[in-house]
């Protein structure tokens, strides 16, 4: 007869938590003495430990949380008030031990206890799916490379190397990778999702996801910072690439490709399954818990399976970044010098604590004592910050993941409407052009998205200053932008009307987007100038 498991204890009415290891150890001791009947084992454990009220409840008051954010204007104050309200709701959840908000924090929805963007929590032996969001493993990845082409030509190649927008790659255009053949698909949270994994490789989606081309100035100080922090491989690769070309002040400039995206449809499906399971399991052992605060205990089978599924999605997302970068390097005949990256929508295990970040960059020290290397984009016209974490435990050792917003996308667009309520497309185009002057900005759909331009975000300088003020990370280098590709404005959100579209209509939408993309590339080819460094 198999030994008693954590799931058996849950089924018998115990609430998952710190007591579980002792319960399982006691059960194992009885089993060594020859007692194997599950019902009798449960009775013995009830005698030894007592039965708890199986219904867990919210705390009467929220536990305190730290704020690495300060207001500089009225919009900031209103935004921070909303962040505090939602964090206070969330931190009544009994399994959460600590919380923090970053300089880019902003509310992420209206449902009770919804963790804000820029929010982080520490949880004992449990995972809250909403606290990593549906865009699981949204992350950054950078490749420093040597190339001889122009910005325009490289962006043309980048446009061909990736894909943006709704949907995924058609079967004839898919990209293979060994990550698709891992023996993982029997996991109940991943079973049947092979198609989502296959169709979204070399695909970045929409919203704030991007592929950015820039320049990284490699100085002696930067290399020494990396070496001192223990990132020897990266420091050595950069040192070898600049040997004979570097001086004490200016350094050497390299092109750098930076991509930002999550796990696409694969992660969205996993999130839906995980959140449903969390609500189901939480309702079985607790009462009065808002759906956004539902959790999966990692000592149960469901929690362990979900954790395993998250790790796979992390590997899949890293493979997706690497595929896009390798396709780009092949098309441009460029040579990679080094690469690095980080997640900012994920769950990380440190001992028995599961750190959740929804738009928060890990900034602690790894198991070897090295400050984590991070990439923090602020907007498409501002430098992407290369950081080393300061491991500031007051703020759960996180840093921001971007600039954040002070108002919703809808509110941003409201200022660019005509008297009749229609969008003033000319005013939108002017605002985007003014905010990105001198940069080669491409929109996959052919039409710009104002809310993803610098107009839609907090001032970059403000967020950067607060990173330093609160001691979250050290900025050791910058990737200065040359150009960027984003999905752009594809019209009404397709996933809200997809059920009403025929396959032919869906193909027509994609074909129109392709034609706009081709026209845009043609215009850039006609006007490009050689700007290689």
Language model features: what each stretch is:
Residues 142:
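N-terminal glycine-rich flavin-associated loop
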Residues 78-79:
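A beta-strand/beta-hairpin structural motif
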Residues 1-52:
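Charged substrate- and nucleic-acid-binding regions of tRNA-handling and nucleotidyl-transfer enzymes
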Residues 45-75:
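Low-complexity, highly charged intrinsically disordered N-terminal segments
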Residues 69, 84-86, 94-101, 107-117, ...:
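Domain-length cofactor-binding catalytic modules of enzymes
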Residues 21-24, 39-43, 169-173, 476-481:
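Short coil/turn segments at secondary-structure boundaries
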Residues 145-147:
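Acidic, low-complexity central loop/insert segments
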């Amino acid at each position: 007869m198999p030994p008693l498991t954590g799931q058996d204890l849950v089924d018998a009415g115990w609430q998952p938590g710190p007591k579980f290891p002792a319960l399982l150890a006691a059960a194992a001791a009885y089993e060594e003495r020859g007692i194997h009947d599950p019902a009798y084992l449960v009775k013995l454990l009830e005698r030894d430990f007592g039965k708890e009220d199986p219904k867990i409840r919210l705390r009467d008051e929220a536990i305190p949380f730290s704020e690495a954010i300060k207001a500089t204007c009225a919009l900031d104050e209103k935004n921070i008030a909303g962040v505090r309200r939602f964090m206070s709701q969330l931190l009544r959840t009994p399994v959460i031990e600590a919380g923090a908000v970053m300089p880019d924090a902003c509310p992420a929805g209206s449902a009770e206890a919804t963790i804000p963007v820029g929010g982080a929590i520490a949880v004992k032996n449990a995972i809250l799916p909403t606290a990593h969001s549906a865009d699981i493993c949204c992350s950054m990845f950078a490749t420093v490379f040597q190339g001889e082409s122009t910005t325009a030509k490289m962006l043309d190649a980048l446009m061909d190397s990736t894909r943006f927008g709704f949907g995924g790659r058609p079967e004839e255009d898919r990209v293979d990778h060994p990550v698709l053949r891992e023996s993982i698909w029997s996991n109940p949270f991943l079973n049947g999702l092979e198609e989502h994994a296959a169709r979204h490789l070399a695909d970045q989606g929409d919203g704030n996801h991007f592929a950015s081309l820039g320049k990284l100035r490699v100085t002696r100080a930067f290399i020494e910072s990396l070496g001192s922090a223990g990132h020897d491989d990266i420091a050595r690769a950069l040192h070898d690439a600049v040997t004979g070309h570097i001086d004490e002040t200016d350094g050497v400039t390299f092109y750098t490709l930076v991509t930002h995206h999550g796990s696409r449809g694969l992660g969205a499906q996993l999130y839906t399954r995980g959140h449903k399971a969390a609500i189901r399991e939480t309702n079985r052992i607790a009462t009065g818990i808002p759906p956004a605060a539902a959790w999966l205990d990692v000592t149960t089978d469901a929690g362990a399976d979900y954790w395993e599924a998250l790790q796979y999605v992390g590997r899949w997302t890293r493979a997706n970044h690497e595929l896009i970068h390798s396709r780009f390097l092949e098309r441009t005949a460029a040579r990679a010098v080094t690469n690095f990256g980080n997640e900012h929508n994920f769950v990380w295990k440190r001992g028995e604590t599961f750190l959740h970040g929804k738009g928060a960059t890990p900034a602690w020290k790894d198991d070897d004592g090295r400050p984590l290397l991070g990439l923090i984009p602020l907007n498409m016209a501002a430098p992407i910050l290369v950081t080393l974490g300061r491991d500031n435990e007051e703020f759960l050792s996180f840093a921001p993941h971007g600039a954040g917003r002070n108002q919703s996308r809808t509110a941003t667009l409201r200022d660019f409407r005509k008297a009749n309520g229609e969008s003033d497309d000319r005013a939108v185009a002017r605002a985007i052009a003014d905010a990105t002057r001198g940069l080669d900005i491409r929109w996959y759909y052919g039409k710009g998205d104002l809310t993803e331009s610098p107009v839609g975000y907090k001032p970059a300088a403000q967020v950067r200053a607060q990173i330093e003020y609160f001691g979250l990370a050290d900025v050791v280098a910058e990737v200065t932008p040359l150009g960027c590709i984003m999905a752009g404005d594809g019209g009404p959100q397709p996933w809200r009307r997809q059920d009403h579209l025929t396959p032919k209509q869906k193909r027509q939408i994609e074909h129109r987007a392709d034609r706009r993309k081709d026209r845009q590339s043609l215009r850039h080819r006609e006007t490009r100038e050689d700007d290689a460094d």
